[in-house]
Amino acid sequence: MIVGLGIDIAELSRIARAWERHGRRFAARVLHPAELACLPAAPVAFLAARFAAKEAAVKALGTGFSQGIGPRDIEVRPLPTGQPQLVLHGKAAARCAALGATATHVSLTHGRDTAAAVVVLER
């Protein structure tokens, strides 16, 4: 049974401007430390996809970025197959448990101008 669903689209140009203006400081505010360690040399699509995933996740949780949940509480981790896996930390994990969710699913995509993500929480 689905207990949460979220979707988000991020414009690559907006993320590129933030990266150009703030560089690694922007990435450190948005990414979980494990994601920051994997930041590629050309990071805009990577950052945009993860930003979209985090926005989609807080929509699925029904909280937005509030109630003590921030972007660093949400991690997108690649499985050995390359498939993205959503890992929640801190208050995001607690909210997920309160919803009764026992499984999380995330799908990422990006094109020339945008990145998008869908998150499903399931019990």
From Swiss-Prot:
Its cofactor is Mg(2+). Keywords: Cytoplasm, Fatty acid biosynthesis, Fatty acid metabolism, Lipid biosynthesis, Lipid metabolism, Magnesium, Metal-binding, Transferase. Signal peptide: none annotated. Mg(2+) binds at D8, E55. GO terms for biological process: fatty acid biosynthetic process. It is found in: Cytoplasm. InterPro entries: 4-PPantetheinyl_Trfase_dom, 4-PPantetheinyl_Trfase_dom_sf, ACPS, Ppantetheine-prot_Trfase_dom. It catalyses: apo-[ACP] + CoA = holo-[ACP] + adenosine 3',5'-bisphosphate + H(+). Pfam families: ACPS (PF01648). It is an enzyme of class 2 (transferase). GO terms for molecular function: holo-[acyl-carrier-protein] synthase activity; magnesium ion binding. HAMAP family: AcpS (MF_00101). Transfers the 4'-phosphopantetheine moiety from coenzyme A to a Ser of acyl-carrier-protein. Belongs to the P-Pant transferase superfamily. AcpS family. This is Holo-[acyl-carrier-protein] synthase. It comes from Nitratidesulfovibrio vulgaris (strain DSM 19637 / Miyazaki F) (Desulfovibrio vulgaris).
